Design a protein with these regions (language model features):
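Short, catalytically relevant binding-site loops at active-site mouths
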Residues: 50-53, 81-83
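Conserved beta-strand segments of alpha/beta enzyme cores
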Residues: 43, 73, 144-146
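Short, solvent-exposed loop/turn segments at secondary-structure junctions
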Residues: 10-12, 50-52, 122-124, 153-154
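Acidic, PIN/NYN-like endoribonuclease modules and their adjacent C-terminal/linker elements
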Residues: 17-21, 25-28, 109-161
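Active-site neighborhoods of divalent-metal-dependent phosphate/nucleic-acid chemistry enzymes
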Residues: 71-132, 154
């Protein structure tokens, strides 16, 4: 069974109060659907980084996020994360201001998981940067990580089959 690393944006969207913003509402629906329809098809893991991020902010929202993460195994910290982060940042694949996002990529890659699930398309699932991120990970001897959004697992809404 393949392993999926759950990044913070997934639990944030899946547990948030329904948004009146249509784009955000779609992301919330996709995150909830992935957790209810797809989660059981994979070994799901997360990291201390995600738990720390999920614990921040509004106490009630944090409680909901942490409850969703409660039964998900947490990866052991890897001392090589900072080395991979530095490569992602120094090659301008992820900006310095988004080092935490680079840490999610590094953590998932070093753990050897098959998928990193995120809705952060600015810094993590950025289509223009992903080929270069994958090339770097391959150069570092960390091939095989695929970074996807829930929509890519769920399929399109216009599928008739």
């Amino acid at each position: 069974m393949d392993t999926v690393y759950i990044e913070t944006s997934i639990v944030s969207h899946a547990t948030a109060w329904p948004s009146s913003n249509p784009a955000t509402a779609v992301l919330q629906d996709q995150a909830k659907r992935w957790m209810s329809e797809q989660r059981s098809k994979f070994n799901v893991v997360t990291s201390r980084l995600v738990l720390d991020e999920a614990a921040k902010g509004d106490p009630d929202a944090a409680k909901r996020r942490l409850a969703m993460l409660a039964d998900i195994p947490v990866l052991e910290p890897n001392p090589d994360v900072e080395t991979v982060v530095e490569q992602l940042v120094s090659r301008s694949l992820i900006p310095e201001t988004a080092r935490l996002d680079a840490s999610h990529v590094a953590t998932a890659a070093l753990a050897g998981v098959q998928f990193l699930l995120t809705q952060n398309c600015r810094h993590i699932a950025n289509a223009t940067m992903l080929p270069r991120v994958y090339r770097l990970l391959d150069e570092l001897g960390l091939p095989g990580l695929l970074i996807y959004t829930p929509a890519e697992f769920l399929g399109g809404t216009d599928d008739n089959d």
